[in-house]
Amino acid sequence: MSENNGNPLDLSSLRNKISSKLRDNNSKKAKKTHKGKDVKASSNSKKVNEDIRREALALGASEEDLKLIQGLSDDDDAKSEQEFDAVADEDADDKGFKNDLQNFMKNVGFDQHKLEDVDDDDIEEESTSSKESKIPAQEKEHAQSNIASSTIEKTSQESIDNGSEQEENTVEEANLSSDQEPESESAEKEKKEEKDGGLITQTTIISSDKLIIPYDKPWYEIPLDPQVGQNDDVEELSKEQIEKLFERGKQTLEADNQTYYEEFTKDSSQAKFMSQILSDGTLNDKISAVTLLIQDSPLHNTKSLETLVSYCGKKSRNSALQSLNALKDLFLNGLLPNRKLRYFKNQPGLSMMLNKKTLAIFYFEDYLKKLFFRVLEVLEVLSHDPIIHVRLQILNHVFDLLTNQPEQEFNLLRLGVNKIGDIDSKVSSKASYLLLKLEQAHPNMKSIVIDAIVDIALRPNADYHTTYYSVITLNQTILKRSEDSVANKLVKTYFTLFEKFLINTDKDNTNGVVKSNSKSYEEKRKKNFKKGKHGGKSVKIEKTENEVLDEKNSKLFSALLTGINRAFPFAQIPASVYEVHMETLFKITHSSNFNTSIQALVLINQVTVKAKLNSDRYYRTLYESLFDPRLVNSSKQGIYLNLLYKSLKQDALNVERVEAFVKRILQVCSHWLNVGTITGFFFLLIQLAKTVPQIKNLLTNTPVDYEYESDAEEEQGDKDIKRKEYDGRKRDPKFANAEKSSLWEINNFINHFHPTVKTYANAYVTGETEQIAKPDLGLFTLSHFLDRFVYRSAKQTNTARGTSIMQPLFSGSRVNDSVLVKASDIMHDQGPVNTEDWLTKKVEDIKPEDKFFYQYFTTKKTADGKGKKSNKASNFDSDDEMDENEIWSALVKSRPDVEDDSDDSELDFAEDDFSDSTSDDEPKLDAIDDEDAKSEGSQESDQEEGLDEDIFYSFDGEQDNSDKKRSFAESSEEDESSEEEKEEEENKEVSAKRAKKKQRKNMLKSLPVFASADDYAQYLDQDSD
């Protein structure tokens, strides 16, 4: 079988069946002896016994069927197996069977294999030779669509005729010209195998002997004329000569295509089936059929390529997308070589002495290059389709081709980069993501991709949307130390965009701009809003144009600053370039977004240190930023603290400036309630004191030190000399005279309400920093505080953000050690507070922020234990108590004189009905009644109040303990003693209640069963009236 991957029909299975039958027929003498033995053995077998009869009946046979086979022997059964086998004796051959077999083979097309009477020895030799020369066919599996499977199923029966015609027609040698190559060795081997074997060995319809260009190899792997490599030194051909060669190659390819088509369609059923699919089939069937034809031999199916490209130009988006998908698969899977295609005139070694096969291949490559460009034009048109799904699919096709094939990479890159400016953010973000993936797949293309993105970002008519997505694509580019040229290009691009947008958004640059007072149609339409029952204009806080513009600019500036900060360490740019753009960066520090200002300050610090510029202006801006009210609510507090710490460490020689920063830090923190930020600033001061220990002098300075003047100053009393004093309103911290003042602001934090702040402040004053840990700003936020009351484990979140190698710092990184503070709020080692065993912990091991939970849960557990004990003691009579309360309340309602002591009737009632009871029982009964009346109304509230007192009494004790300055351990011991006393009191109360219940039961038993008629006399009189 041929090695072509795209054969239209695969008849190997059918050929194997027929050849096996014929081979068995040719080897009849070899099996003669064995068959004779089998016949003798079958003649000696018995007839159908009773077991076989029962089995036949069980399988559905009837008695009549058994009668039909009663007279048959086993020899008769064996005859059915001898259709293609040898007979028992050659002299006893069935002439009728032989004639039928020959007629069948003649109809099928195997008339050349007539059965002839030959000698046994000759037959044995032929059978052995056929076994030796038999070569198993190689079957290759390749992906086919639904139409391919249906084609094989429908034409499996008709393909037998194709095989017969292939055997009938003798192979004629092609009359090639002098410039044609001889036949390939593979074709000769196949021809010899057909002659030697005498069986069907060719399973393909097309005969490669009639084709000039073989179809069973990729067109770019076919060997060319050897003269191609020898024509490098030949003079260039003229335009007329190239055109002649082009026409010769075109004619050769067209002739070979025609031969291929005739070979493929010489079977009328095959041609009819294919034409029916291409005319009446569905679009999916047509595309699948054409794709299979192209896969067989793209060089011999140029018409199929034209048909598939024509499907891409249909108005239906679905058909266009399906056709483009099929074309993309063809381009990526064997149709294109792993190099750029060449035009015919650009082929190396082009001369007038080349053979037709080489010219045809050169022509096909030229044709394929032009066809690929036509497909790109279709992609460009569909990339502007109004449907987002279509644009996304086209974008995927463009980058698939760009990533896997070098052909037309410049135009493909231009198409992909242009989609960054798409009006829909989904398409823009998808284009940005695919560009970053392209840079990872082809690192050598990084510079080319960046150039294309920069070109679209710096267009004069580029809008904000295009520029923003271009910048966020550039700032995600991964750089290396060796790529300083790429980093320099990025830094220059960022600074250019800075200047462009600062000029456009500068408020002082609005010269001669007059706003039009004319309202648009939409504004006029909105004025006539709906009125009526469900009408009314919704009140929305609409942002002004300046607010929207500022918000957009802050996002763009933030992206630009991120890119500069990432590219700055890799860039090699002289300091003069940075000095030109420093004014731009200082303008950004005064923008409306504080986070953008922080990023600008980070960049200015890097530029100042690396270029060794004057840092006075930077420290003035940083000193001023401490008074910015937006710092309290900023999400970049961690970055700001790290920047402040790094800057003050770098300025260790200017002690006066550092001391001014220390004073202002404490002044600002005294007005804040954010505990996390305050602890962060104190940790900054603790670490800064290790580098600049002179700041501790502020703790010992007093105003008295500067009240006394020197003797030299006393002598100059006539001169008006001002004494230097601290002035916190100075713009420049160098001239604030902080060294002339003392750090009295520290008193507010030593006596702070929060224990953590107090701990850090005391550590700074005393210098005992061994137990002071690096603070986490996220632990003191409101969200973290509320999360502590959620009694469940925290959700496991992925620390990695995206697939980029550039990730934010996390707690396990090595770089984390160089960071002053963090704001992660990651508490992997802590579970819910209700799951911890607080009773087993010591008071000394409790953290300051966990004292509340320690007291709460320890008290609650002790209260729950007491409640369980009291419930066990009172469970046996709880139901009786409920029943007695209901009975007693019913009696009180029916006999009000039972509880009314002042009424005379009650006295009579008591004397008559309680004559057996003593006088001491009456006050006891009244006391019981009063107690029941109180217990009925406030039974539940007393239980709740008692529970609350049990749970929360320790907080009152905590307040008393703090007033009396007792330690926590002493208060816990006193609480245990008070709890024991309460237990004794509760036991006494329970025993007293039980005694009262017994008295009540005795009183109820002494009451009469029936009431007297005198008590209801008034009601009886009313009924009689």
From Swiss-Prot:
UniProt xrefs under InterPro entries: ARM-type_fold, CCAAT-binding_factor, CEBPZ/Mak21-like
GO annotation terms (biological process): ribosomal large subunit assembly; ribosomal large subunit biogenesis
Domain of life: Eukaryota
Record PTM Phosphotyrosine, positions in chain: Y708
Biased composition (Polar residues): 144-163
Stored SUPFAM superfamilies: ARM repeat
Principal location class: nucleus
An example Gene Ontology molecular-function term: identical protein binding
Residue numbers of Phosphoserine PTMs: S62, S73, S80, S275, S710, S874, S878, S977, S978, S1024
GO CC terms of this entry: Noc1p-Noc2p complex; nucleolus; nucleus; preribosome, large subunit precursor
The keyword Cytoplasm is annotated on this UniProt entry: no
Segments of skewed composition (Basic residues): 28-37
Record keywords, A-Z: Acetylation, Nucleus, Phosphoprotein, Ribosome biogenesis
Pfam family, any one: CBF
Modified residues (N-acetylserine): S2
Span list, region Disordered: 1-51, 70-200, 709-729, 863-882, 891-1001
Acidic residues bias (residue ranges): 73-93, 117-127, 898-920, 928-951, 971-987
Biased composition (Basic and acidic residues): 128-143, 186-197, 718-729
Record's subcellular location: Nucleus, Nucleolus
Family assignment from sequence similarity: Belongs to the CBF/MAK21 family.
Note: Present with 15000 molecules/cell in log phase SD medium.
Record text on subunit structure and interactions: Interacts with NOC2. Forms a nucleolar complex with NOC2 that binds to 90S and 66S pre-ribosomes.
Function: Required for 60S ribosomal subunit synthesis.
Protein name listed in UniProt: Ribosome biogenesis protein MAK21
Species whose genome carries this gene: Saccharomyces cerevisiae (strain ATCC 204508 / S288c)
Gene, per the UniProt record: MAK21
